[in-house]
């Protein structure tokens, strides 16, 4: 895929079950790639309010949605749920978010992006979002219901 208008410090994610890759553009919009045959970039329509800034995404298979964090620090976790017809010309994808009330607030991410330091995980029966803002940062875990 040539020059997809993706900032260098963001992370795309693949929804394997849907055969779709999604990423956030430099302007904060959503772009997707239909991976079912010859890859084709398209702009899905969205509902709700997105973060409006750079975002690293991860696919949450159990929740059937993309999960992400903006690079602004803070606790807000963003969700981008593809529609039942997520491909070009299909139904709108839905933005939503949550901001946990407790716990420590992660710092801003490293200026070069998260580079894979954002993961949806299940461990010892606990499901959530594991986030490491920088290579020498303390890890943060957002529990299930958040991720």
What are the residue ranges of the model-derived segments?
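Surface-exposed loop and turn segments in beta-propeller and other repeat-based domains
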Residues: 1-4, 45-49, 90-109
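Beta-propeller domains
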Residues: 1-42, 51-53, 73
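Repeated scaffold domains used in trafficking and secretory/extracellular systems
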Residues: 3-14, 49-59, 105-120
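Entry beta-strands of beta-propeller and related beta-repeat scaffolds
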Residues: 17-22, 62-68, 123-132
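Short glycine/acidic-enriched loop and turn motifs that connect beta-strands
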Residues: 28-29, 71-76, 125, 135-138
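Short loop/turn segments immediately following beta-strands, especially the blade-tip
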Residues: 33-40, 79-93, 143-147
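Loop/turn-rich, solvent-exposed surfaces of beta-rich toroidal or solenoidal domains
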Residues: 49-88
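Blade-level signature of beta-propeller repeat domains, shared across WD40, Kelch, NHL, RCC1
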Residues: 109-147
């Amino acid at each position: 895929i040539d020059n997809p208008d993706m900032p260098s410090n963001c992370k795309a994610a693949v929804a394997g079950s849907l055969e779709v890759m999604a990423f956030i553009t430099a302007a904060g919009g959503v772009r997707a790639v239909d991976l079912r045959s010859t890859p084709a970039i398209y702009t899905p329509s969205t509902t709700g309010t997105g973060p409006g800034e750079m975002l690293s995404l991860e696919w949450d298979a159990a929740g059937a949605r993309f999960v992400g964090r903006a690079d602004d620090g803070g606790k807000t976790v963003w969700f981008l749920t593809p529609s039942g017809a997520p491909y070009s010309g299909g139904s709108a994808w839905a933005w939503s978010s949550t901001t946990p009330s407790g716990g420590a607030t992660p710092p801003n991410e490293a200026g070069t992006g998260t580079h894979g330091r954002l993961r949806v995980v299940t461990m010892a029966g606990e499901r959530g979002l594991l986030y490491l803002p920088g290579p020498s940062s303390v890890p943060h875990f957002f529990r299930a219901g958040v991720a």
